Amino acid sequence: MNNMNIIIADDHPIVLFGIRKSLEQIEWVNVVGEFEDSTALINNLPKLDAHVLITDLSMPGDKYGDGITLIKYIKRHFPSLSIIVLTMNNNPAILSAVLDLDIEGIVLKQGAPTDLPKALAALQKGKKFTPESVSRLLEKISAGGYGDKRLSPKESEVLRLFAEGFLVTEIAKKLNRSIKTISSQKKSAMMKLGVENDIALLNYLSSVTLSPTDKE
């Protein structure tokens, strides 16, 4: 089996440590870089001979952003780099939008010790990886009748930040878009999800996330 060079990006040092220790148990994996913000990650990518990037969805870095914005930048400028998203965000609408970016895998942090090795093994065989836990979450969209009303990546990014507690003005600044654009994208997403106000939106985002009984 060919060796796989991997970069890890997460803004929590303890998470970086845990992932690295887990990957060190796989003899054909080499960790060639670790970064805590997107700016350092992007600045160093050209210098590293990496096959795979394992990155958190929410990560600081003013210049290149995070989440879907960062992933799209990497896909555009480093097309040969495989991407596995590691995230605490278990909202199915957002996970669906991330998968639409044609990444190689997505892993919830709750299941990372088990699912990351599986994702890398799938990559070795030229396959993509979606764990059962994520597949179950995505089924909730279809069960709720929203399967034919998929959020666009930009709408998903706005909802992700809204769910994290950011105001529309703060989201606009973070994503370098106008307040009017952010408001329009938020409204469009709400119409697709069938919710009429912010309280209903937050209730929806909460209700379709992973419940304790769903965790593996």
From Swiss-Prot:
Residues 144-209 form the HTH luxR-type domain. SMART domains: HTH_LUXR, REC. GO terms for biological process: phosphorelay signal transduction system; regulation of DNA-templated transcription. Phosphorylated and activated by RcsD. Keywords: DNA-binding, Phosphoprotein, Transcription, Transcription regulation, Two-component regulatory system. GO terms for molecular function: DNA binding. InterPro entries: CheY-like_superfamily, RcsB, Sig_transdc_resp-reg_C-effctor, Sig_transdc_resp-reg_receiver, Tscrpt_reg_LuxR_C, WalR-like, WH-like_DNA-bd_sf. The modification 4-aspartylphosphate is found at D56. Belongs to the RcsB family. Interacts with RcsD and RcsA. Component of the Rcs signaling system, which controls transcription of numerous genes. RcsB is the response regulator that binds to regulatory DNA regions. Can function both in an RcsA-dependent or RcsA-independent manner. HAMAP family: RcsB. This is Transcriptional regulatory protein RcsB.
